[in-house]
A protein has these predicted regions:
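Extended recognition/assembly regions associated with phosphoester-bond processing machinery
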Residues: 1-486
Length: 486
């Protein structure tokens, strides 16, 4: 017959083509709640029994509403019989919790359950940055990915994250299927709502311990209890002289993150701000005037403040690790390029530092090597239970690399979460001030105020840390208006 429409053409030329029935709407009368657990389930696929029971434990203990976002995937090679007979078939356990409509959890966070994304999509958040408008958003997907999205000046950056899954990995015997299976994450997003404010944290199932950890609590199929001490707290870039007082209190104050979680290690990125010797101020007389008026042009005093900040916050049973960072390195850049004769305020400190660097300079097989000036002064201060890492010095805990700041990428390129996500080991970095999760890499945010002199315009900066739990799972902790949990 005559082909009249696109559907006629497809049906005539593609024997596998069929017009799908209208989408079934899954929702229920959802009462406003303080906490929500959000995950995803693949069609015609069983739940992971132990993880599902752990989710039930969390739901009960936290008094949370559980939302399971349904995902469709055609898999003719599925090991589970009949998986392709009905695209609308879901495991019995998840059916009462299915949710596939768009729904605001509060004024600033929306569940984008109507956004259907294939489980094998390598970047499930791609293109969805504006879908939720000014609201943060959660998208159902088996691969965990998180981004901080820039917003207009004067507004807090928004978060976009996927949910992780509660069902077993069930992918085709293909390249895309194998990659999808590799990134399949048994996880969920825990949301705490407090008026217009919300707190959002990913929770990961750990097969070795058959549990998941949220902050200081471990959940299993049988119950909950105190979680073991985390291996480390990787803090958003510190910049001591520019640190936000609310973030400092939330992190180190009474009832704060460090007191509550009691991490074994504190990992410091951009500890030193180097405002006194910032190379970007060169030639700007107004920066010089402002610094002279406030005494913030004294490099030695700034270095000492940074060192003492660590000393006062490193307890007897905690170990501090200072990661080599680009702002710490500004001290070296100042020594290399500046003339002490033109800087009487810092002349003595400059000469003393330069002399130590000269005495430590040597020519090796790699080329010229000389001491890092900030590392030199930090070691000279003898801060107990602390260590400052040299350039390219490895430091790993639980199989996760914690030694990279994030400013340097592969083969001399500029670093980013994107080009550090596939280097063969998991990692937690800083540098960008914009929190994120992308495959093997997590990026902490910043501990500074969210608006500084060098981030004008739309910004994706957020105050956040990343905790490395005892089970080696990583979890973002966001500090919103001085609060880190509801």
């Amino acid at each position: 017959g005559v082909v009249r429409t696109l559907d006629d053409f497809r049906e005539a030329h593609d024997p596998t083509y069929k017009i799908l029935a209208p989408t079934t709407v899954y929702s229920r009368d959802l009462k406003p709640a303080k906490r929500y657990l959000i995950t995803a389930a693949q069609n015609a696929t069983p739940v992971h029994k132990v993880w599902w029971r752990g989710l039930q434990t969390m739901t009960k203990k936290l008094g949370a509403e559980l939302l399971v976002i349904p995902m469709r995937y055609k898999n003719p090679t599925s090991q589970w019989s009949g998986s392709q007979q009905n695209a609308e078939h879901w495991a019995t356990e998840v059916r009462p919790f299915l949710w596939n409509v768009r729904h605001p959890l509060n004024a600033n966070l929306t569940v984008l359950a109507d956004l259907k994304v294939q489980p094998t999509m390598s970047s499930p958040l791609s293109g969805a940055e504006a879908v939720s408008l000014e609201s943060s958003g959660i998208i159902g997907h088996t691969k965990l990915q998180l981004r901080s999205i820039p917003t207009a000046p004067g507004r807090m950056a928004k978060l976009l994250t996927t949910s992780g899954a509660c069902t077993e990995a069930n992918y085709t015997d293909s390249r895309a299927g194998r990659i999808g299976e590799f990134h399949h994450s048994l996880s969920a997003i825990l949301v705490e709502v407090d008026g217009k404010r919300f707190h959002l944290r990913p929770v990961h199932f750990d097969a070795k311990t058959a549990s998941c950890t949220d902050l200081d609590t471990r959940y299993t199929a049988k119950g909950s209890g105190r979680a073991p001490r985390p291996l480390a707290l990787v803090m958003g870039d510190t910049h001591v002289d520019a640190i936000c007082p609310l973030v400092e209190k939330a992190t180190f104050g009474e009832g704060g993150i460090v007191e509550t979680l009691n991490p074994q290690h504190l990992i410091w990125h951009d500890l030193l701000d180097s405002y006194s010797v910032n190379p970007h101020h060169a030639g700007n007389p107004f920066n010089a005037v402002a610094k002279r008026q406030t005494g913030t042009d004294d490099a030695k005093a700034e270095v000492q403040r940074a060192i003492e900040f660590v000393r006062k916050r490193t307890t007897k049973d905690t170990f501090s690790v200072i990661v080599g960072s680009n702002h710490n390195d500004m001290l070296r850049r100042w020594i290399v390029s500046n003339d002490w004769r033109r800087d009487p305020v810092n002349a003595e400190f400059y000469l003393e530092t330069a002399l130590a660097m000269v005495r430590g300079t040597k020519l090796t097989g790699k080329g010229t090597e000389y001491p890092d000036p900030f590392a030199y002064w930090f070691r000279l201060a003898n801060v107990p239970n602390s260590r400052v890492l040299d350039l390219d010095e490895s430091f790993m805990l639980g199989g996760v690399a914690l030694d990279m700041h994030g400013n340097e990428g592969p083969n001399g390129s500029r670093g980013s979460i994107h080009n550090l996500r596939r280097i063969g080991v998991k990692s937690i970095i800083g540098h960008g001030h914009s929190p994120g999760t992308d495959e093997g890499c997590d990026q902490a945010g910043t501990s500074t105020r969210l608006k500084l002199e060098y981030n004008s315009g739309p910004s994706s900066w957020l105050n956040s840390h990343v905790v490395l739990h005892a089970d080696c799972k990583r979890q973002h902790i966001f500090i919103i208006e001085g609060e880190w949990r509801a």
